[in-house]
Amino acid sequence: MAEFVRAQIFGTTFEITSRYSDLQPVGMGAFGLVCSARDQLTNQNVAVKKIMKPFSTPVLAKRTYRELKLLKHLRHENVISLSDIFISPLEDIYFVTELLGTDLHRLLTSRPLEKQFIQYFLYQIMRGLKYVHSAGVVHRDLKPSNILVNENCDLKICDFGLARIQDPQMTGYVSTRYYRAPEIMLTWQKYDVEVDIWSAGCIFAEMLEGKPLFPGKDHVNQFSIITELLGTPPDDVINTIASENTLRFVKSLPKRERQPLRNKFKNADDSAIDLLERMLVFDPKKRVTATQALAHEYLQPYHDPTDEPVADEKFDWSFNDADLPVDTWKIMMYSEILDYHNVEGAPNMEEQFPPQ
């Protein structure tokens, strides 16, 4: 049976198997603490994410289950992948993934990016999104800090905790404001994979300009800034707004014309401007898809249709409408972890489920 080692990180107890050493804090998220560690089995550096009290409420248990299922299902070079998972004696859950040295947010705040890096990063984002969207998954929270990069400029999309099924009736409050698609802000009713394309467009613009494109102070200000550049939304988009208050607000705004993006991005290539124009479109159905973006002239230096795979099968979202007690989520989670280790060839199941 595995030996568990305890360490205090930022006042939090990290309780991990002795396979991992040299714990160093990397970052704190809303639902967990991430540390770097050395995997003594593979001699690689890894990221270890502790999910705090995953079984404290049904909502948190379901969220953790969803993240685990997504990490297990999504297998692609531009998407973060799971290398281990275990439950500690204290019943915290630990996800172990590859460790990349930095993220796009840190890169963008440290120095301007050269053209070839912008191209290569955008290509990898779109390559990852093509795969994720083909699996029937919408990321919903794409932003520079969720895009990890290593010293070879390999890029991986991470943090699928908010990800949801492709569903025309999707609802709710997601995504950091600057990168949030207008249909999320406006309708609060239905959106699809196109929200990720908008977010990627905002990230693309930030790489070109070195600062956020739409830095809104709140929802109202955010939408106002968007219309200053992209003009007033067309009537057919306005007519999809379900909330009367939102509709009143949008109709109260002064009519604005779309500004040429060339005026804003004076140093960018024409092909970069053209692709950005196709990503930042109010009407989601007229936005370029990830597959179309990969074939665009701007990404031509990297585009290879034979090496831009789609998912083998759609992600199974059947659990997502379930309203279950914590104990049921716990049993389902244990089952998923056992399945993961059986498939991956775990040496010993007792290591994953120590006696309580």
Curated annotation (Swiss-Prot):
GO BP terms, alphabetized: stress-activated MAPK cascade
GO cellular component: cytoplasm; nucleus
Keywords: Activator, ATP-binding, Cytoplasm, Kinase, Nucleotide-binding, Nucleus, Phosphoprotein, Serine/threonine-protein kinase, Transcription, Transcription regulation, Transferase
Organism superkingdom: Eukaryota
Modified residues (Phosphothreonine): T171
Chain ranges for the short sequence motif TXY as given in the UniProt record: 171-173
Enzyme class: transferase
Pfam families: Pkinase
GO terms assigned for molecular function: ATP binding; MAP kinase activity; protein serine kinase activity
Free-text note on domains in this protein's UniProt record: The TXY motif contains the threonine and tyrosine residues whose phosphorylation activates the MAP kinases.
Name of the protein: Mitogen-activated protein kinase hog1
Source species of the chain: Trichoderma harzianum (Hypocrea lixii)
